[in-house]
C-alpha cells in the first residue's frame, strides 16, 4: 500500500520510495493528480475516449525520482500489459527505460489502492498473445505499430 505525503512531493509505496517528480507534460500531471486525489474515480479514462487507464509508478532511470505515467488498462487474469507505444513514435517512452533500469520498483494503481508489481519484458508467442489483448483494449495500438519501424515493447506486470 502507498501513502502520499500532504505536500504530494513524496510518495511512499514499497518498494518505490523517494521524491516524486511530476511529468513535464501538463495533461499527464493533471490526470495523475486527479486520479490519485479521487482514488481512481475521476480521470480514469484516456482523455475523451472513455477507455480505462491505470497509473504506473516507476523510479526514474536517470533522476532516481519517483515518476508516474497513465497507461491504457490492458488486464487479463490478474496481470497487466504495459505497452510502450509512445503513439507510434520512433523512440520508446521514457518509462520504458525506467522499467529496464528498476524492474523491482514498480507499482500500479487500478482503482483506489496502488499495489506493487513484478514486471518483465515479453517476446515471441507470449508477446503476440498480449499484443492481441492490447489491440482489443485499445485499437489504435495497431496503427501505432504500422507507424513505427520499431517493435513496440510489451511488459507483463503481475501483483507481488
Regions found by a protein language model. Give the residues of each.
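Residue-level detector of beta-strand face positions
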Residues: 55-57, 107, 156
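C-terminal edge-of-domain segments
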Residues: 3, 7-13, 24, 143, ...
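Short helix-to-loop capping/linker segments positioned immediately adjacent to catalytic or ligand/cofactor-binding
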Residues: 42-44, 63, 141-145
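Short beta-strand segments
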Residues: 50-85
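Short, structured beta-strand-loop surface elements
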Residues: 16-19, 86-141, 147-151, 159-160
Amino acid at each position: 500500500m502507498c501513502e502520499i505525503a500532504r505536500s504530494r512531493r513524496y510518495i511512499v509505496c514499497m518498494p518505490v520510495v523517494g521524491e516524486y517528480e511530476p511529468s513535464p507534460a501538463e495533461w499527464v500531471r493533471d490526470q495523475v493528480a486527479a486520479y490519485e486525489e479521487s482514488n481512481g474515480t475521476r480521470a480514469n479514462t484516456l482523455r475523451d475516449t472513455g477507455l480505462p487507464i491505470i497509473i504506473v509508478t516507476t523510479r526514474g532511470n536517470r533522476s532516481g525520482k519517483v515518476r508516474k505515467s497513465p497507461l491504457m488498462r490492458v488486464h487479463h487474469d490478474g496481470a497487466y500489459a504495459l505497452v510502450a507505444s509512445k503513439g507510434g513514435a520512433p523512440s520508446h517512452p521514457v518509462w520504458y527505460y525506467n522499467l529496464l533500469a528498476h524492474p523491482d520498483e514498480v507499482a500500479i494503481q487500478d482503482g483506489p489502492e496502488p499495489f506493487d508489481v513484478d514486471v518483465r519484458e515479453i517476446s515471441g508467442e507470449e508477446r503476440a498473445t498480449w499484443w492481441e489483448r492490447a489491440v482489443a483494449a485499445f485499437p489504435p495500438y495497431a496503427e501505432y505499430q504500422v507507424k513505427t519501424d520499431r517493435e513496440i515493447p510489451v511488459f507483463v506486470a503481475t501483483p507481488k
